């Protein structure tokens, strides 16, 4: 069994408060969950209102499937962030 994990660092230039940050992060998490069968969580519940880190995890018997899934998640995250006025500044994928 394989585990695929993706960490996304997001810059939120349009966010002027923690409320704005939570709104963007929640929307991004919900859309990724709805589009892919993955677990999504905010990894740094800090009070920095213009930056967030989101973790995405999936489990499968096929590493090739997870590789494709994580690539699709990264592409979707870039698109979703762009639509929300945010920017993915870094992404890291790891397989365990």
Predicted segment positions?
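Absolute protein N-terminus
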Residues: 1-2, 96
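Active-site-flanking beta-strand signature of metal-NTP-handling nucleotidyl enzymes
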Residues: 4-10, 55-56
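Amphipathic alpha-helical assembly/interaction segments
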Residues: 11, 27, 31-44, 66
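A generic structural motif
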Residues: 12-17, 60-64
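C-terminal binding/interaction regions
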Residues: 21
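Solvent-exposed alpha-helical segments within well-ordered globular domains of core cellular machineries
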Residues: 26, 30, 34, 71, ...
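Short, charge-patterned binding micro-sites
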Residues: 41-62, 94-96
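C-terminal structural segments of small proteins and small subunits
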Residues: 59-96
